[in-house]
Amino acid sequence: MNKIAFFLPIVACAAALILGFDYHYWWAYALIAAAAEGILYLMFYLNNSSIEYLSGHIVRLEHHYPWTERCEKSRTVGGKTERYVSYVDHEDEYIYELNTGHTGSIPEKEYERLVRLWPTYKSEIHVQHRHCVSGGGGEEIKWNGDESITETKTYTHRYRNPLKNSYSVNRGQKIKKDEAKALGLFDYPEPVADAEQQVVLVDPDVYYNGNIDETNRELQRLNAFCGAEKQIHVFILLFPSNEGSQIAFKQRDYWKGCNKNELVVCLGVNDKQVDWCETLSWMDNDALNNEVKDYFRQNYNKNLTEFVKWLRAHLDNWKRVEVKTMKTSSQMSLGSTLYLWISASLISAFVLLCAYWIGGK
């Protein structure tokens, strides 16, 4: 039923011809309808997509040498247009590449630090720059495989989320930001530029007699070294144990069912002791969820860093659900359905108005 909404701009274009608009401009009507379809699809995609977090580790570094670019420009002087040439100097650029293929800029100090740590040799590379008149070139160095001497990074990726605006059990109730704050729920931690994402989140009322920074770093490494292969991103959330395990499901609702690659381990902590554990994910198979709960039943007072090491060795039972196999995408919520039809109607009205302006009689 909702798919019909995407045909409304085409119907508006056909209506323009039926109403007697100049048919010689049929190509203009078609272009307007095509542009309208693109805008409608983009709006629908953004409304039904989510941002997930992906992690990786640096496997290659590049240093691009300074270079000078020749630019041809035009300007108007005394009513006449004349062309002139200017030169732009570009400084050194330092680039990292992750095992996932993602690339980005890296500060010079971090580049130099990693180069000193890596026992491999630099090699010259040819760097292509448009309109380069001097300088250029560069060098690269590759990681040798030692986990202890590389860095991890986390970045965002947008994907179609069939749970976001559907009548899915996993989606849960809608919780607003102020309500979440009152309940003591966590916001998604954003990756920090040139640093990493905090993946162990601790409620201010929790007293945990352990090294959170150490656990956080160990979990960042799990996400970076196992994330691409296992399609997983793990968070650990520490709540006061007296909140009860129901707070974990409110957290799931606030995070809109979580993301497809996430395993969220929620723990009720009282000093050194873990009183309860709940896991949140899209998995159909509960094997790993049950293993995690069993771990904390038997190791309720163990250091969380040891748990992360244990989890890394037990990821064989993790399998991310494929979005294409989910059957919720056609079961849109009432709000999303109204949003789609109102948007399609307004865009179609705009198509008809443009057609009238071009070929109306």
Predicted regions and their residues:
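Catalytic nucleophile-His microenvironment captured as a short glycine-rich beta-strand/loop
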Residues: 252-255, 261-278
